[in-house]
Amino acid sequence: MARKRTNKRNNSDKENGNVGVVQNKDSASSKTTEPARLTKHKSLARKPSQNFITRTIWTFLLLGIFFTALAMGHFWVVLLVTIVQIGVYKEVIAIASVPSREKDLPWTRFINWYFLMTTLYYAYGESIYAYFHHLFIMDSFMLPLVLHHRFISFMLYIIGFVLFVASLKKGNYKFQFSQFCWTHMTLLLVVGQSHFMINNLFEGLFWFFVPVCYVVCNDVFAYLCGKMFGKHPLIQVSPKKTVEGFLGGWICTVVIGSLISYVLMHFKYFICPTRDLSTSAFSGLNCTPNSVFLPHTYTIPAVFVDTFRLPETITLAPIYFHLAIFATFSSLIAPFGGFFASGLKRAFKIKDFGASIPGHGGLTDRMDCQFLNGVFVYMYFQSFIAEKSTSVADLLDTAVYSLTTTQQVQLVEDLQNYLISHGKTSVQAICSKLLQNSK
């Protein structure tokens, strides 16, 4: 019995000793893991600050590139927009790509890029014809390309269509047709919409820069107002957006956007349309400003004059009324382009469209609202602001494209007789020489 008791004591001592060893090991391991946890927390604390620094640096770098292009002239802005187009197209196409399948379908990637080049050729050709056709009328090589631009573009597209059908491979039909549809949707939303932004640019830098500026302004102030006052969520697809930020961004965009526009409208380099891509901020532009930039006197209704003790008339440029509409669309409608992009990212379970801009994600993440806003400004400008007039270039365009050689000679003779009858005798020798050369 004594031996059994001593054995039990020894066993209990061993068990207690083992427990002590385990406790010592646990305490030792806890001591070793504490520094690791602290290091991890420090690294997590540093990460947001590093991301903020990277984001800030790239923000100023992008602003520098953008304003440099603006100063260098319209051609460089068009080039910048083209680079953005290609970058966004690449990011969106990459979402639906499946590398393992594309290895078996080597033509898929080529066809995607071929359709992009064909669409760019058509879009830029349309813009060049609309705004710079007078530069190509006298060029015997370029004139046929301008005259038959749409037919050439269509035939280039047909070549791509035939290549796609010829590349169809058994077992991959569904994937290939989904790629075909995805490519055309991307071309419509990216190249199609940015085409109108370039047309805005040719109507005057004002109509390009102001919408871009409004979207950026709304993005910044919607974020700040949401951080300070945000309580009610706005839309499910983008949970961080709030009603307070949405409305606060709109109010701030209307006010600050009007101040920015007030400064820009005093520079003809911004408000004048361009018909020469070699212009820059240093060469300047000269034109008769659009009437929306000129002050108009408006009569205030008597009800408001009596109620609020306002003056009977007010002098104001009509552009401010249009800018209020631009700011409203940029703040309340254009963000839905961003919500559309957010929904697309959630559908494909990705955080960003790419990593081309460190700290910001991809180009698509920054341009999702700009494209939709650019289309609206173009449609609004052409409907309510653009001044329709016939220029010398338009008349020459009609004479070259619509009249036969005999009719063109008759036009010159009639124009000569008209000018001579009005005392412009100096043109007689010039016209006579031209007619002799033509005959």
UniProtKB/Swiss-Prot annotation:
Query: What are the protein's GO molecular function terms?
Result: phosphatidate cytidylyltransferase activity
Which family is it part of?
Answer: Belongs to the CDS family.
Q: What is this protein called?
A: Putative phosphatidate cytidylyltransferase
Indicate the segments annotated as coiled coil, or none if absent. none
Annotated metabolic or biological route of this protein: Phospholipid metabolism; CDP-diacylglycerol biosynthesis; CDP-diacylglycerol from sn-glycerol 3-phosphate: step 3/3
Give the UniProt subcellular location, in the record's own words. Endoplasmic reticulum membrane
Purpose: Supplies CDP-diacylglycerol, which may play an important role as both a precursor to phosphoinositide biosynthesis in the plasma membrane and as a negative effector of phosphatidylinositol 4-kinase activity, thereby exerting an effect on cell proliferation via a lipid-dependent signal transduction cascade.
Listed under catalytic activity are:
a 1,2-diacyl-sn-glycero-3-phosphate + CTP + H(+) = a CDP-1,2-diacyl-sn-glycerol + diphosphate
GO BP annotation list: CDP-diacylglycerol biosynthetic process
Q: Report which superkingdom the organism of origin falls in.
A: Eukaryota
Lineage here is: Eukaryota, Fungi, Dikarya, Ascomycota, Taphrinomycotina
* Segments crossing the lipid bilayer: 52-71, 76-98, 110-130, 145-165, 180-199, 245-265, 321-341
Protein's organism: Schizosaccharomyces pombe (strain 972 / ATCC 24843) (Fission yeast)
